[in-house]
Amino acid sequence: MKKIGVLALQGAVDEHIQMIESAGALAFKVKHSNDLAGLDGLVLPGGESTTMRKIMKRYDLMEPVKAFAKEGKAIFGTCAGLVLLSKEIEGGEESLGLLEATAIRNGFGRQKESFEAELTVEVFDDSPFEAVFIRAPYLIEPSDEVSVLATVENRIVAAKQANILVTAFHPELTNDNRLMKYFLEKMV
């Protein structure tokens, strides 16, 4: 059975663990770099990207997460996870630099502009994915290496590149585990 870690610094950690388990894998909380040992994949949950980055630096997790990805292990970032995984963040904040695109933080607005939308996701059949956007980012300027999986208002809200999968929305806050199953079956 595949072993997936969830970076447990803040955000919807328990919801991701439930989603991983519902998709048929074992889930583990990751708080320190040694927690990455033996994992097949990693989830970077939503939360506040600046705070998450500061905590990752405090616990010396930035370089170990980069090394995890460079070993070819899969990483799934949602919302703040998308921001942290991007090569660049608008405004010049430090990132992990693992996805060849630029992240626009809070691209759809602040908390009061949060919304839900039915998305067509390229890797699914025709049934829409009910997506929850909370202070959501989006991506711009993807390289040719990046596959766009979904857009809202012509803004990139889901993408993948090699072993990296990102969404601007929160699949863990729905009952639809198709994205987690895709991550487990196609990327891990």
From Swiss-Prot:
Q: Does the keyword Methyltransferase apply?
A: no
The residues listed in the UniProt record as binding L-glutamine, with positions renumbered to this chain, are G47, E48, S49, R105, I134, R135
Which one GO biological process term can you cite for this protein?
Answer: pyridoxal phosphate biosynthetic process
Keyword Lyase carried by entry:
yes
Any one GO CC term of this protein is: cytosol
Which terms are listed as keywords in the entry?
Glutamine amidotransferase, Hydrolase, Lyase, Pyridoxal phosphate
Record: active site: C79, H170, E172
EC? 4.3.3.6, 3.5.1.2
List the pathway annotation.
Answer: Cofactor biosynthesis; pyridoxal 5'-phosphate biosynthesis
Q: GO terms for molecular function, please?
A: glutaminase activity; pyridoxal 5'-phosphate synthase (glutamine hydrolysing) activity
Per the UniProt entry, the disulfide pairs are none
State the protein's purpose: Catalyzes the hydrolysis of glutamine to glutamate and ammonia as part of the biosynthesis of pyridoxal 5'-phosphate. The resulting ammonia molecule is channeled to the active site of PdxS.
What does the subunit comment say?
A: In the presence of PdxS, forms a dodecamer of heterodimers. Only shows activity in the heterodimer.
PANTHER family attached here?
PYRIDOXAL 5'-PHOSPHATE SYNTHASE SUBUNIT SNO, PYRIDOXAL 5'-PHOSPHATE SYNTHASE SUBUNIT SNO1-RELATED
NCBIfam families linked to this entry:
PLP_synth_Pdx2
Q: Into which family does the record put it?
A: Belongs to the glutaminase PdxT/SNO family.
Could you identify this protein by its name? Pyridoxal 5'-phosphate synthase subunit PdxT
Q: Which organism is it from?
A: Listeria innocua serovar 6a (strain ATCC BAA-680 / CLIP 11262)
